[in-house]
Structures are given as structure tokens and as C-alpha cells.
Swiss-Prot record:
Gene: trpB2
Pathway: Amino-acid biosynthesis; L-tryptophan biosynthesis; L-tryptophan from chorismate: step 5/5
The species this protein was found in: Aeropyrum pernix (strain ATCC 700893 / DSM 11879 / JCM 9820 / NBRC 100138 / K1)
Protein name as it appears in the record: Tryptophan synthase beta chain 2
GO MF terms, alphabetically ordered: L-serine hydro-lyase (adding indole, L-tryptophan-forming) activity; pyridoxal phosphate binding; tryptophan synthase activity
GO cellular component assignments: cytoplasm
UniProt subunit comment: Tetramer of two alpha and two beta chains.
CDD domains: Trp-synth_B
Family: Belongs to the TrpB family.
Swiss-Prot/TrEMBL cofactor(s): pyridoxal 5'-phosphate
Function: The beta subunit is responsible for the synthesis of L-tryptophan from indole and L-serine.
Length: 449
């Protein structure tokens, strides 16, 4: 057995020096964000209260490649431990008795255990450069909050995190990790903001959602007196841009492996890990030089791609953000308390929404129990316990491998294992105990419009 064929590593000299920006390659322009009061496109300068100038410029840039600053590139290597490995899941292939080759890019080797550090370091750097003293953000499962807390510690920027209340209770060690890095962490809804107090008055046991936590973080920044900026973990173009370091590395690793993926898979909440892994490959599909299928996977409890409406909607629950054209369930949708906290969001990235509209990306949804079953199988075969979010991609990869077996086809399947689940074991405990519940909405708020 040639074990060298099952792990593909790059040297630190091969860590990408530029990010890939998909905007100039999309089949149509992304509809602009709108001012909800006027219905007119938002002037990018109006976002200056929330974001530093460099990130606003990246949000609308038409440059295909944007250089990674030297300080961020160094942090990717010395702090985030890039490059991350591309691994072949040979033991899973054997367990499935499939002719398919299954590969996964493993982002769980980063210090905070997920892909989120890739944009956290970039955002902390650009804010530090502009003299920002404090970053305020939301987090679902705590992966993003952990990453920004670590990045803040690295670049010397204070961090405040509003963590979705159900995850705050389900995943206490994520809070511990964030506080170890020096962050302030509050359960959302909280008593720190007007919007949070309003929701708690209505329901003292409110489980919260990413949309609510975003609202609280933005309200916090607006009332900060100018010494704080908002930091977002997904959805916006500059966030997805920073994540393309994943796919750009994977391109080189697949060349080393001597194969090219027929199917690429990623889990989707807002879209950053899916985009980071697939966008560098999607550019070839858009140019007609590739026929790779791209599968975006979401929970049936939060089915924005499979049951949502492609329309303008707020990015947060309180309606503080500009209106974004995206696949959405409606910003008032109350996402059930599933364990994949990072996927509990009502919309998806505008760039991903365009790709869904044009059929470049396929969408698929699963119940959480079948996702945990797939993650259990993967853990026993490969030794890695996937984050509940990443486990959605594992489930789709297994399904595609079984389909290949049944049809007698050899296909190359690749997915992004965006994080480990070692701080998400409560969900696995409930799965093993048989108490894990499935959720699926009967009605979608956005469909009532």
C-alpha cells in the first residue's frame, strides 16, 4: 500500500499569496444591497460605520485576485498552521465498498478547529490597520467567535461576541475558549442591547438565532461611539473571498494527487466554507473548462436554499442591515435549536444565490439525525469527529459514494471537512442516547410575501 497516495501536503512556500474574487466571473452581476428606507442601492461609503475601508473595497472589487497582505500571510502560516492537508478517505471507501475516491480538505487542524480563522485574521488585521479598538460579532456554534477571538489576540484588538443562546448552553467550552483568548462573550438574546431585552421580555428562554445575534452586534457597534467595528463570519463577499485560500490550496493538492474532482461538496449556513472550498474550482466551470458538480448542503430545519425565496431581505432579524438579494426563509424565521449552530441562519450569500439561480450549484437538505449517523460512520472509519456543520457535507459525500457503488461508476468526490466536533459532543451524546430530534418547518415566512 502506497500511503503517500492518501495524504497530500503543501510546503509553507505554497500557501497562496492572493485570494480569488468570484465577482468578475459570475454569470450575472450580484444585485446591489438596497437602503430599506429609499429602495436605492447602498453607497459603499455608508458601510464605513460598520467596516474598515479595505473590507468595503474588497466587498465590491472587480479584481479577480486580491493580494494577501504580508502580515496576514505570515499569520496564516505561523498562527493558523496553513497549509491544511488534503486527505483521501480510504477507510471510508472500504467501509462503503465503493469504487468512488473520496477526498476531504481538513480545516480542523487550525488552532480553533475550523476554517473560520482564515477570514478572522484578515478582518482583525484590516481593522487594526485602521486603528479600531474593538470588534463586535455574532457566533452560532462558537467556531466563528473562537476564530475572531484568537485573531484579536494575535493582532491586539479587543473582541466582544454575542453567542446564540442555545449554543451558549449546548457548547460551554466554546465560551471558555473565546474567553481564554480574551474575548467578552454574551448569550444572545442578551440584556446588553435594546433588541435583546425586547426579545427576552417576550420569551425569557428565547433560544436565539444568528440573525438575532447579528442584530445585537450591529446595535452594539452603532452605539459604541465610534471605537468599535462589526465583524461578520459569513455571507458577505469579502468574507467568502478570504476563505478561498482553502480551494486555492486544494487545487495544488489535487494536481499532486493526479486527479480532479467530479463532485465537490460543502455545508452551507451563510456560505463561507462552501465558497472557500469550491469557488476556485467553480471559476473553471464558469469558463467551460470543467464539468464538476457542486453540491451545497443545508439542514432541513433551516432550508434557505431548498425552500427559501430568492428575494431582497435583511441580513439580521431586527432589520438593521441593508437589504440583500439572496435565497432566504425570511429574516423573522425562528430557526429550530439544531446542534449545527453555524447553519442556523435564514439566508445565504448573495454570490452563492446567483450560482444557485443559474444551476451552477445544486442544493440539498438533510435532517440532523441522518447527518449525525453519517458523522458517526465517518468517525469510526477515519478517526475524526466532524463538527455538526461539516457533517452535512460528510452525509452528502457518503450518499454520492453509495450512488457510485450502485451504478458501478468510479468518481472523484471531494468535500470540505470545515472543522472538528470535539467541542460539540453534547449533540453526539444526544445522538447516541437516541434523544436527538429532527425539525422541519411547515411554513416559510418568506413564502408569504
Amino acid at each position: 500500500m502506497d500511503l503517500a497516495r492518501y495524504r497530500f501536503d503543501l510546503s509553507i512556500e505554497e500557501v497562496p499569496t492572493s485570494w480569488y474574487n468570484i465577482l468578475p466571473d459570475l454569470p450575472e452581476e450580484v444585485p446591489p444591497p438596497l437602503n430599506p428606507k429609499t429602495g436605492e442601492p447602498v453607497d459603499p461609503s455608508a458601510l464605513a460605520k460598520l467596516f474598515p475601508k479595505a473590507l468595503i473595497e474588497q466587498e465590491v472589487s472587480r479584481e479577480r485576485y486580491i493580494e494577501i497582505p504580508g502580515e496576514v500571510h505570515e499569520a496564516y502560516i505561523s498562527f493558523a498552521r496553513r497549509p491544511t492537508p488534503l486527505l483521501r478517505a480510504v477507510n471510508l471507501e472500504r467501509a462503503l465498498n465503493t469504487p468512488a475516491e473520496i477526498y476531504y480538505k481538513y480545516e480542523g487542524v487550525t488552532p480553533t478547529g475550523s476554517h473560520k480563522i482564515n477570514t478572522a485574521l484578515a478582518q482583525a488585521y484590516y481593522n487594526k490597520l485602521e486603528g479600531v479598538e474593538r470588534l463586535v460579532t455574532e457566533t452560532g456554534a462558537g467556531q466563528w467567535g473562537s476564530a475572531l477571538s484568537a485573531a484579536g489576540a494575535y493582532f491586539g484588538v479587543k473582541v466582544r461576541v454575542y453567542m446564540v443562546r442555545v449554543s451558549y448552553l449546548q457548547k460551554p467550552y466554546r465560551r471558555t475558549l473565546m474567553e481564554l483568548y480574551g474575548a467578552e462573550v454574551y448569550p444572545s438574546p442578551s440584556d446588553k442591547t435594546e433588541f435583546g431585552r425586547k426579545l427576552l421580555a417576550e420569551n425569557p428562554n428565547h433560544p436565539g438565532s444568528l440573525g438575532i445575534a447579528i442584530s445585537e452586534a450591529i446595535e452594539d457597534v452603532i452605539n459604541s461611539g465610534g471605537n468599535a467595528k462589526y465583524s461578520l463570519g459569513s455571507v458577505l463577499n469579502h468574507v467568502l473571498l478570504h476563505q478561498t485560500v482553502i480551494g486555492l490550496e486544494a487545487e495544488k493538492q489535487f494536481r499532486e494527487a493526479g486527479v480532479y474532482p467530479d463532485i465537490m461538496i460543502g455545508a452551507v449556513g451563510g456560505g463561507s466554507n462552501f465558497a472557500g472550498f469550491t469557488y476556485p474550482f467553480i471559476r473553471h466551470r464558469l469558463k467551460g473548462s470543467s464539468s464538476t458538480r457542486f453540491i451545497a448542503v443545508e439542514p432541513k430545519a433551516s432550508p434557505s436554499m431548498t425552500r427559501g425565496v430568492y428575494t431582497y431581505d435583511y441580513g439580521d432579524t431586527a432589520g438593521l442591515t441593508p437589504l440583500l438579494k439572496m435565497h432566504t426563509l425570511g429574516h423573522t424565521y425562528q430557526v429550530p435549536p439544531i446542534h449545527a449552530g453555524g447553519l442556523r441562519y435564514h439566508g445565504v450569500a448573495p454570490t452563492l444565490s446567483v450560482l444557485l439561480k443559474h444551476g451552477i450549484v445544486e442544493a440539498r437538505a438533510y435532517h440532523q439525525r441522518e447527518v449525525f449517523r453519517a458523522a458517526h460512520m465517518f468517525a469510526k472509519a477515519e478517526g475524526i469527529v466532524p463538527a455538526p456543520e461539516s457533517a452535512h457535507a460528510v452525509k452528502a459525500a457518503i450518499d454520492e459514494a453509495i450512488k457510485a457503488r450502485d451504478e458501478g461508476r468510479r468518481v472523484v468526490i471531494a468535500f470540505n471537512l470545515s472543522g472538528h466536533g470535539l467541542l460539540d459532543l453534547q449533540g453526539y451524546r444526544e445522538y447516541l442516547d437516541g434523544t436527538l430530534e429532527d425539525y422541519e418547518p411547515e411554513e416559510i415566512p418568506a413564502s408569504r410575501r
